[in-house]
C-alpha cells in the first residue's frame, strides 16, 4: 500500500498548477519567465493575485491530500511523511513537465498541515513574518522550513527524518536564491 500511495503522491505532485494555469490564462510560462520558478510567488509576478492564489491552493492540496490518504489507509506517521515527500518530489521534478518544477514550499506546507498542524502554523507564521519584514519570499521559505524541526523532534519524532530530508530538498532548490541573497541581487516585492 505504501508504494502505491507514494507513486500516486508523486503523480499528483507532478501536476503543476502554475504551468497549467499559465497556459489556460495565456500568461507566460513561469519556468521561462520572471524568476523561472513554477510556483505561486512567480505567478503573482507574472499573472496576478488571482492565479497566484489558485496556484498556492493547488500546491497546498498536492501536499495535503496524499498524506490524508495515507493516514486513511492506516499508514503510520513516518510512512505518511514519506508519502508527502513523494508529492513534494513530484512538484520539484514533475513527470508531466520535463522534470522542471517549482521549489516545493507550498506543497511542503500542505504536507505539514496534514502531518502535524502546529508545525505548519509555525512555518506559515514564520514565513509571513519574515516576508513582511524583508519582502523576500525565498528568505521567508529558507527561515520558515527549518524552524519546524525542533517542534517535530519534540512532538512527533517519527516525522523528524523525513522532514529533515524535506528541509534539505527545499534549501537545495533555493541554492540560486541563497547565492543572490548573499550577493544582494535577490528579488523583493
From Swiss-Prot:
PANTHER family the record matches: GLYCEROL-3-PHOSPHATE ACYLTRANSFERASE-RELATED, INNER MEMBRANE PROTEIN YGIH
Key word Transit peptide present: no
Catalytic activity: an acyl phosphate + sn-glycerol 3-phosphate = a 1-acyl-sn-glycero-3-phosphate + phosphate
Enzyme Commission numbers on file: 2.3.1.275
Subcellular location: Cell inner membrane
Pathway terms, separated by semicolons: Lipid metabolism; phospholipid metabolism
Annotated GO CC locations: plasma membrane
Main location: membrane
Protein name: Glycerol-3-phosphate acyltransferase
Function of the molecule: Catalyzes the transfer of an acyl group from acyl-phosphate (acyl-PO(4)) to glycerol-3-phosphate (G3P) to form lysophosphatidic acid (LPA). This enzyme utilizes acyl-phosphate as fatty acyl donor, but not acyl-CoA or acyl-ACP.
Family: Belongs to the PlsY family.
One of the GO biological process terms: phospholipid biosynthetic process
Species annotation: Pseudomonas putida (strain ATCC 47054 / DSM 6125 / CFBP 8728 / NCIMB 11950 / KT2440)
